[in-house]
Amino acid sequence: MAQHNRYISPFSTRYASDEMQYIFSDDNKFKTWRRLWIALAKAEKAQGLAITDEQIAELEAHKDDINYEDAIAREKLVRHDVMSHVYAYGLQCPKAKGIIHLGATSCYVGDNTDVIVMREALQLVRKKIIGVLANLAKFAEEYKAMPCLAYTHCQPAQLTTVGKRATLWMNELYMDLEEIDHQISQLALRGVKGTTGTQASFVELFNGDSAKIKAVEADVCAQMGFAKVVPVCGQTYSRKVDYNVLSAVAGLGQSAMKMATDIRLLANFKEMEEPFEKNQIGSSAMPYKRNPMRCERICALSRYLMVDVLNPAMTSGTQWFERTLDDSANKRIAMAEGFLAADAILNILLNVSDGLVVYPKVVRARVMAELPFMASENIMMKAVKKGGDRQELHERLREHAVAAAAVVKQEGKPNDMIARVEADPAFGLSREEIETELSPEAFTGRSAEQVTEFLRDVIQPVLDANAEDVGQHVELNV
């Protein structure tokens, strides 16, 4: 039932996927806590502590049916979330109550869960980036040879191709993918470290047997699916980990904003558009409007994501000695919402990249309006071959280009540079001779080949290795 009398995050109601929302949900968090308590009990039993199979079986029987009401009521009394859930779990598991959380500190479940959740979230981000790359690969291949204007300073420069421009977007997303893969590979559990990272409580439990303590930690690590634990820590793992992870995710915001901005500008030129639904309304006052609202939303969310990375940066710097609680409130907002923002951006990118619309005739017309300027050097070389003076012709072309530009800008008329060159006896060229130099395909360089090589050498290996992530389709809520 909808709740209209309280604030609910737009990430939950409008933007983020159910999958990402579940990853950062209380249910996923507290179920992971219970998995960690079970893993600890098993590891401690294996090293000789008095823990029975019956106790472990009882813990496993209730690992998913969390008695939230009991935990909530207890937290109101003791003001401690971890001990409230230890208590609630103990109510369900009376035989195992005495060995839950044995030797551990709150950060055993809190920090280890945060690392596990970050890995799950990174893997979902990774999956969706690959889906976007797959969509753009098809687009780039289809349009790899279609000439279009290239821009520097947002002014027409030379020509590129529609597909080649798409590879620029893809290359940045590929860079994000590499960084996210790096962060996944570097993630390590906090492990079993005790209250200030010294493992003092486990020294007491195992009578100073370091080998057993290290074995417990390695066992827990393996049970949770990790290859390593942090080598040293205070009460928490270093908050630089959060900064590194969110920085990688925020890189996606940069790439997405650049791509979405390009599409918005191209929509203004009427060369390309994002998908537009049959019943979509662009403006309440202007029925003809086709606003690039999805790409605008990508840009809006990307700004949020890029700024959000400042939170873990400052949090990392304010951790005094072994730990303060400066991190907790900020971290639970910044990390979750950073990933939710990235997820929302990727949902829109998946939708947009799956339905980009190109208008070839507009693209061609805009090319042909500028091509006479771009072809001036070729025209000059042809006239030189017929006996013209290179320096004189260069000056004549400059004068014609300035005059033709004035006609376009001041009079709103078509570019008449070709007619000016044809009428200038210094060139001695017929219209047919001039127009042979006006094939757009001759001005795109190796664009089509570059697309082929990029897709073959960089993108296709990624798609082949992650075939299950190709072909994703997203329906947006709004």
List where the protein language model places each region.
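Short beta-alpha connecting loops at secondary-structure transitions
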Residues: 21-25, 70-72, 280-300, 322-337, ...
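Amphipathic alpha-helices that form helix-helix packing interfaces
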Residues: 40-43, 125, 129-132, 136-139, ...
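Glycine-rich cofactor-pocket loops
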Residues: 137, 141-163, 273-289, 322-329, ...
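A short, charged helix-loop
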Residues: 218-235
